[in-house]
Amino acid sequence: MFVDQVKISLKAGDGGNGITAYRREKYVPFGGPAGGDGGDGASIIFEVDEGLRTLLDFRYQTHFKAKRGDGGQSSNMHGKNAEHLVLKVPPGTIIKSADSEEVLADLVENGQRAVVAKGGRGGRGNSRFASPRNPAPDFSENGEPGEEIEVTLELKLLADVGLVGFPSVGKSTLLSIVSKAKPKIGAYHFTTIKPNLGVVSTKDQRSFVMADLPGLIEGASEGIGLGHQFLKHVERTKVIVHMIDMSGSEGRDPYEDYKVINEELSAYEHRLEERPQIVVANKMDMPNAEDNLALFKEEINDDSVHIIPLSTFKHDHIDELLYAIADKLEAVKDIDFSKDEEEDLGVNRVVYKHTPSQDKFTITRDDDAAYVVSGKAIERMFKMTDFNSDPAVRRFARQMRSMGIDDALRARGCRNGDIVRILGGEFEFVE
């Protein structure tokens, strides 16, 4: 089964908790603090595996949670870092934030990696807080929470050649002849509803990857008939093979078919106009095909359009087509697809990391008049504080003051004894 778009949830591993411990050894008076740091949580990394061709694995498992780091130990021993969770994806996978649709990574080459959800830092042990003023701190820090994000994975096939055209013009039949691919073939429209890939080898030992794309219809560039799902796979092909039913057996005019498909390609992505194209006049074994081809050439009236007449039924001129495709591929330069897509979409692509929002905090009111403080920075500190330790609670209060939260609460009208909430935890405001 071919799957080219999925939505999944990611939760990177939390950092391990630091520990409060002291050095207790014979003949070592005033040993001091000896609590070790927690280990770092596991990040979630996407890696390209050239052996994959679909996102099928992500259809049945949509939630991924990485492991947390181990806790710190006494004698200043650091907790073990968690092993990163590596998710394999096929070449051509684009990772977007499900909320903002920002492109987080565009993975093309085999082995390419992108860290999309970063694991939390391990919490610090009490020895890390020692100072001349407080040489034996009796508190430690919890691990930092790992990032949590929903992403959309979108696959754009990486094929050298894309077969385009109206339904039932012979695209799947051609692919089955020139490669070992076994696409579904039937005497009805839209037999192919998912792209098929095949590796093609010419008699002079040249090879390329060909994609049989589902049939297009008028309005495909506007999404009609699942047009967007099909057209996106054309974007990354280097050569377009435009197949036309020259017999007109479906009651359509070959020249009109040619114009409509090219207009849809241009409307979807204007750079596709510049992509090398070979026109395949198929079904030349049928009645009226020769006359239709002569009229077609007359209507185009452009010698630069490369037209190859053939019959997939009789296997005529197949080698001529394959040689022409191989020649076009050798002549075309490498195309930087990612750059083109960024210019069109106006996106800022962030590869190998996800940068969260840096908002400090916001203050709102609950229905019971309690003040609610929210924001990534303060919520991160809240989760990393051990509220079973009075010194840790006092440190959290100092951090709130240094961030300006106390002053902001006063400005909002908060008075002595009022309730302040952070992530469900309740505090009493004290002047």
From Swiss-Prot:
InterPro entries from the xrefs?
A: G_OBG, GTP-bd, GTP-bd_Obg/CgtA, GTP-bd_prot_GTP1/OBG_C_sf, GTP1-OBG_CS, GTP1_OBG_dom, GTP1_OBG_dom_sf, OBG_GTPase
Q: Name one Pfam family in it.
A: GTP1_OBG
Residue stretches making up the Obg domain: 1-158
Q: Does the keyword Magnesium apply?
A: yes
Q: Which key words tag this protein in UniProt? A: Cytoplasm, GTP-binding, Hydrolase, Magnesium, Metal-binding, Nucleotide-binding
Which Gene3D superfamilies does the protein's record reference?
Answer: GTP-binding protein OBG, C-terminal domain, GTP1/OBG domain, P-loop containing nucleotide triphosphate hydrolases
Q: What EC number(s) has UniProt assigned to this enzyme?
A: 3.6.5.-
Q: Where is the OCT domain?
A: 353-431
Q: Which domain of life is it from?
A: Bacteria
Renumbered to this chain, region (Disordered) spans 118-144
Oligomeric and partner information:
Monomer.
The record's comment on protein family reads: Belongs to the TRAFAC class OBG-HflX-like GTPase superfamily. OBG GTPase family.
Main function:
An essential GTPase which binds GTP, GDP and possibly (p)ppGpp with moderate affinity, with high nucleotide exchange rates and a fairly low GTP hydrolysis rate. Plays a role in control of the cell cycle, stress response, ribosome biogenesis and in those bacteria that undergo differentiation, in morphogenesis control.
The record's annotation in PANTHER family points to:
DEVELOPMENTALLY REGULATED GTP-BINDING PROTEIN-RELATED, MITOCHONDRIAL RIBOSOME-ASSOCIATED GTPASE 2
Specify the protein name.
Answer: GTPase Obg
Taxonomy of the source species: Bacteria, Bacillati, Bacillota, Bacilli, Bacillales
What gene is this protein translated from? obg
